[in-house]
Design a protein with these regions (language model features):
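A short beta-loop-alpha structural element at the N-terminal edge
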Residues: 4-16
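Conserved GNAT-fold acetyl-CoA-binding loop/helix
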Residues: 17-43
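A short helix-loop-beta-strand connector motif used in the catalytic cores of GNAT acetyltransferases and
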Residues: 44-54
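Conserved beta-strand in the GNAT
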Residues: 55, 61-69
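Conserved acetyl-CoA-binding loop-helix of GNAT-fold acetyltransferases
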Residues: 93-106, 133
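Conserved active-site alpha-helix within GNAT-family acetyltransferase domains
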Residues: 98, 110, 122-140
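Conserved GNAT acetyl-CoA-binding A-motif
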Residues: 109-119
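Conserved beta-strand-loop-alpha-helix junction that forms the acyl-donor binding cleft
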Residues: 118-127, 146-149
C-alpha cells in the first residue's frame, strides 16, 4: 500500500472535517463538533493561522490526519500540541498511523520544539497502546479545565 504523507492545504479541509467528525463519533462526542469549513479555512489559512496539519493519502484519498498547533509552556518552552490524530477505520493497523506519527515527530525537530503533547481518553486503549509503542508517557496526573464560549459570555456580562 503506497501512502503519501504531506502538509495539508486548503482544498483538503472538507476531508479534514470528515475525519474530525469520524474521530468525534468514535469518542462518543459527535454532537460537540460545531466547527464549520469556513471556520477551518479562516483559522488555518487566514491572516494569522492558528493550526497546521499533515494528511496521509492513498490513491488521492485522504485517509489520515495529524492536526496540530504550537503550545508554549512557561516551564519548558515550545511544544507541538497534537489536537487530533485519526486514521480512517479501514486503514488502521496497516502502518499508516505510524508513518503519519513519525512525520509529525519530524516537525518537532524541524521547528526545534521541546516535545509533543496530546490528550487521549482513558478508555481509548487502542490509542494508548499505539502511543506507548513510541515510548510515550501517558500521564494521569492532570485534569483538564475548560470554559465554553457561552460561559465566557455569561461571565463577561457580570464584569
Amino acid at each position: 500500500m503506497k501512502i503519501i504523507i504531506r502538509k495539508g492545504i486548503k482544498k483538503d479541509l472538507s476531508s479534514v472535517l470528515n475525519l474530525i467528525k469520524e474521530l468525534a463519533d468514535y469518542e462518543n462526542a459527535l454532537d460537540q463538533v460545531t466547527i464549520t469549513l469556513d471556520d477551518l479555512e479562516q483559522d488555518g489559512f487566514g491572516i494569522q493561522p492558528c493550526y497546521w496539519f499533515l494528511v496521509a493519502e492513498k490513491d488521492d484519498e485522504i485517509i489520515g490526519l495529524s492536526f496540530y498547533w504550537i503550545r508554549y509552556s512557561t516551564w519548558k518552552g515550545k511544544f507541538l500540541f497534537l489536537e487530533d490524530f485519526v486514521i480512517k477505520e479501514e486503514y488502521r493497523r496497516h502502518g499508516v498511523g505510524s508513518k503519519l506519527f513519525k512525520e509529525t515527530i519530524k516537525i518537532c525537530k524541524q521547528l526545534n520544539l521541546n516535545g509533543m503533547i496530546w490528550q487521549v481518553l482513558d478508555w481509548n486503549s487502542p490509542a494508548i497502546d499505539f502511543y506507548k509503542k513510541f515510548d510515550a508517557e501517558i500521564s494521569k496526573d492532570w485534569l483538564n479545565g475548560r470554559l465554553t464560549k457561552l460561559q465566557i459570555e455569561n461571565i463577561n456580562k457580570l464584569l
